[in-house]
């Protein structure tokens, strides 16, 4: 396990409202908030990776891809949803890994991240000697002509994850472990419940298209709005209505 992850092991875990506050700041361009979200959710990414361990891929490679899914979920999360971030993020991370496996041979993200991580490590050493202190993410990014996001992603992707039995979140004193998040408690897989396939079948064609574009094609609300010829606000309202309808359907099953 990475030294920094060990160091963070005994730190209190973020509650859902704290995560959402960080997401809000991140979506407004706060890089520190974005870095914190990634740091605090590394265990969540690793828990998802466990589902794909025996498919012939290196766990570290899948972890790197999962980090990309995590960052996408931060960017796309709608704070108006009455849903925990972890509930939204896990399917996004799973989807990113599944796409990587499906497109293997054409997408070489893991290799490029490893190469980038090596460059970043060397750059940090050089800048530390030059500045007499540890350089910031922005300084490393500027030195290598990268974006701050690329630097953070490469650094986090190379950090070793921790146990899936550790608590990820505590909601009103109720601890939630990684295993709780992804375990198959019934014959139906956890992700199938998140996808709500049966509930989707109850939607009309436009609603199905919105779900498909948002959650299977990773399109933003603005992109969906352009596709449907309506406003982003309308898409947001429709999406909330759809999610509520699907949730009710699941509760009745």
Curated annotation (Swiss-Prot):
Keywords: DNA-binding, Sigma factor, Sporulation, Transcription, Transcription regulation. PROSITE patterns: SIGMA70_1, SIGMA70_2. Sigma factors are initiation factors that promote the attachment of RNA polymerase to specific initiation sites and are then released. This sigma factor is responsible for the expression of sporulation specific genes. It is responsible for directing gene expression in the forespore compartment of developing cells of Bacillus. PANTHER family: RNA POLYMERASE SIGMA FACTOR RPO (PTHR30603), RNA POLYMERASE SIGMA-F FACTOR (PTHR30603:SF19). Belongs to the sigma-70 factor family. Pfam families: Sigma70_r2, Sigma70_r3, Sigma70_r4. GO terms for molecular function: DNA binding; sigma factor activity. The keyword tRNA-binding does not apply. The gene is sigF. The lineage of its organism: Bacteria, Bacillati, Bacillota, Bacilli, Bacillales. A motif (Polymerase core binding) lies at residues 61-74. GO terms for biological process: DNA-templated transcription initiation; sporulation resulting in formation of a cellular spore. InterPro entries: Cro/C1-type_HTH, RNA_pol_sigma-70_dom, RNA_pol_sigma-B/F/G, RNA_pol_sigma-F, RNA_pol_sigma70, RNA_pol_sigma70_r2, RNA_pol_sigma70_r3, RNA_pol_sigma70_r4. Residues 221-240 bind DNA. The keyword DNA-binding applies. It comes from the Bacteria. This is RNA polymerase sigma-F factor.
């Amino acid at each position: 396990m990475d030294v920094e992850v060990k160091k963070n092991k005994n730190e209190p875990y973020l509650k859902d409202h704290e995560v959402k506050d960080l997401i809000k700041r991140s979506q407004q361009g706060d890089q520190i908030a974005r870095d914190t979200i990634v740091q605090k959710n590394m265990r969540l990414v690793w828990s998802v990776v466990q589902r794909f361990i025996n498919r012939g891929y290196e766990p570290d490679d899948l972890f790197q891809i999962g980090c990309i899914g995590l960052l996408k979920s931060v960017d796309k999360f709608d704070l108006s949803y009455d849903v925990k971030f972890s509930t939204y993020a896990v399917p996004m991370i799973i989807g990113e890994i599944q796409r990587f496996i499906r497109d293997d041979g054409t997408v070489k993200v893991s290799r490029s991240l490893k190469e980038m991580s090596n460059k970043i490590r060397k750059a940090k050493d050089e800048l530390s000697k030059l500045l007499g202190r540890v350089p910031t993410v922005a300084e490393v990014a500027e030195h290598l002509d990268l974006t701050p996001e690329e630097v953070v992603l490469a650094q986090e992707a190379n950090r070793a994850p921790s146990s899936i039995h550790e608590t990820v979140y505590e909601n009103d004193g109720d601890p939630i472990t990684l295993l709780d998040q992804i375990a198959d408690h019934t014959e139906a897989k956890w992700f199938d419940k998140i996808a709500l396939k049966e509930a989707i079948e109850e939607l009309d064609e436009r609603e199905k298209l919105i779900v498909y574009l948002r959650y299977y094609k990773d399109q933003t609300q603005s992109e969906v709005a352009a596709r449907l010829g309506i406003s982003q606000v309308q898409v947001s309202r429709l999406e909330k209505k759809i999610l509520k309808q699907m949730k009710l359907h699941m509760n009745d099953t």
